[in-house]
Amino acid sequence: MSQQARVRLAGTSPEDLDDICADVREIANKTGVELSGPVPLPTKTLEVPSRKSPDGEGTATWEHWEMRVHKRLIDIDADERALRQLMRIQVPNDVSIEIVLED
C-alpha cells in the first residue's frame, strides 16, 4: 500500500480555493497519481458584533462583522514528483495550505 498525502486548504475566498484545487488536480493528471477530492468541508462563520457609537450615548445600535472560512480536503498518492510540484504552487496570502503524509 502506498503512502497518501492529505492536503488541507483553508481560506476566506472560495474562488481562490477552487483555483488551487484545479492546480492540484492538474498536477495529479500530469504525474499519473490517484486523486480523491476536493471535499468541501463545512464553512465556519466568525461573527463580531460592535457598537456603532463610540461614546456609548444614544440608542444601542450594533454592527455585525463576519468572516467566512472555507475549507477543502484533498487526498493524493505521495509520489515524489507530485509532492515537489505541489510545493511549488503559488498560494495567495489569504489561503493556508497544510500537507500531511499518512500511511
UniProtKB/Swiss-Prot annotation:
One GO cellular component term: small ribosomal subunit
GO molecular function: structural constituent of ribosome; tRNA binding
Residue segments, region Disordered: 35-59
Keywords: Ribonucleoprotein, Ribosomal protein
SUPFAM superfamilies: Ribosomal protein S10
Quaternary state and interactors: Part of the 30S ribosomal subunit.
Function as written in the Swiss-Prot or TrEMBL entry: Involved in the binding of tRNA to the ribosomes.
Family to which the UniProt record says this protein belongs: Belongs to the universal ribosomal protein uS10 family.
Name of protein: Small ribosomal subunit protein uS10
Gene: rps10
